[in-house]
Amino acid sequence: MEKKSLLILGTASHVGKSSVVTAICRILSRNYRVAPFKAQNMSLNSWITKDGKEIGIAQAIQAKAAGTEPTADMNPVLLKPKGDCVSQVILLGEPYADKSAGQYYDSIEEMNGVLEGALERLWKEHDIIVMEGAGGAAEINLYERDVVNVGTARLTQAPIILVGDIERGGVFASLYGTVALLPEDVKKNVKGFIINKFRGDPEILKPGLKQLEEITGIPVLGVLPHFKLRIPSEDSVSLGDKEGAKNEKEVEIAVIRLPRISNFTDFEPLEGLVKVHYVDIDEDLGNPDAIMIPGTKNTINDLLDLRASGMDKKIQAFKGKIPIFGICGGYQMLGRTIFDSGVENGVEAEFEGLRLLDIGTKFGEYKKRTIQVTKKVNGYGPILKSIDGEDIKGYEIHMGVTDSNRTVFGDDGAIDEEGLVIGTYLHGLFDNENIRNALVRYLCEKKGLEYRPEEIISENDAYEELANRFEQNIDMEKLYEIAGI
């Protein structure tokens, strides 16, 4: 069977490659067995597969849009920045090593073998693979070490569609310049352009589109309008693009934007209900209705940065007044102490936490817990009492072990005596409708506001909405021709 594939590259980061791949996966899945693939992803937002492997959340979303189970082969290399130019390398879903950029590039040959194996396994089970590049495709300083753009193009010889973002300006120069800078053996496979995030009447673009096609000999497949995606974001670049909720003047949740923040997608489900405001650690915290401390790639360093900035005292001042949630690394920070045997920060030491929960955490070995879980709510306190005994789902991605005398979700997490400080290892907590609504209902009632339940759109409907918008604006006949299907 012919190994069919399609490669989506971009002119820069955050131009919409992931959403384009998601849309194409959804559309093609109606008639074909489709798998997404991203050779190398650098992201702190990750997902745990059913067999406990860790991959980038974008590939999990794309797989679900394609109607297939996410697997580690769809994102064989995941880089999770830890700071100081060092990243944790996740190889086929398992922690491999902490490497500097130079050390990682020295192991590129080894990575290429991993990628080839992953692709072969995917092709055995699927009719077509829709692949995604990373950042800008024309990073000429990286061509000899690149595995995700030029490297994937050379490995698969896939037809390429190049995506540009018009919202930030300069899209024609970006598309033309990217093609001009690509190596000749890759350039020949660029078969189409997509312009993304356009606001206004697309008629005014026609002269530019025509000229771009004449200069490059490459057709423009369509112009996608700017619209609000209802699927999770991939990286922290998009934190600056968050739109307010319809009730943003009524209820506000402050998320502490830790220097090494990870899995900020945990809070996206709240954005349709309240204003979710990301606060840098050196900013004024203001007067929020709830505080969230997210996950982090380095709990201890972010805890030390919180303390150095004075944000620790600002958070502590709200104890007993408003809900304070900590997820994963944020949960660990809420406790009395964190003991590190050297696996987290390089040296053996004990650090004082925020002391908002009666827990202690120990980093004893370089071992990560990655698992999908279902837990029952222990309905202690004013927020959770209405959903006592109900099930919630989530996933864990963490190092360290935490002791807790008063758990909050089954055997997980902790809650203080007043029921307002809640810590948990569960990512995806607010994906659960019962948790989400219990919190927002409490916040509304506390302010004397009428609680208005959210307008719920299912995950499946969100994928269909994206796919339909794509089909309405893209020359699908030409796209099928390019893909060879």
Curated annotation (Swiss-Prot):
UniProt KW keywords: Cobalamin biosynthesis, Glutamine amidotransferase
Positions of the catalytic residues: 328, 427
A molecular-function term among this protein's GO annotations: catalytic activity
InterPro entries named in the record: Class_I_gatase-like, CobQ/CobB/MinD/ParA_Nub-bd_dom, CobQ_GATase1, CobQ_N, CobQ_synth, GATase_3, P-loop_NTPase
Protein family per UniProt: Belongs to the CobB/CobQ family. CobQ subfamily.
Residue stretches spanning the membrane: none
The GATase cobBQ-type domain, residue ranges: 250-435
Protein's pathway: Cofactor biosynthesis; adenosylcobalamin biosynthesis
The species this protein was found in: Methanosarcina acetivorans (strain ATCC 35395 / DSM 2834 / JCM 12185 / C2A)
Function of the molecule: Catalyzes amidations at positions B, D, E, and G on adenosylcobyrinic A,C-diamide. NH(2) groups are provided by glutamine, and one molecule of ATP is hydrogenolyzed for each amidation.
Pfam families: CbiA (PF01656), GATase_3 (PF07685)
Protein name stated in the entry: Probable cobyric acid synthase
Record GO biological process: cobalamin biosynthetic process
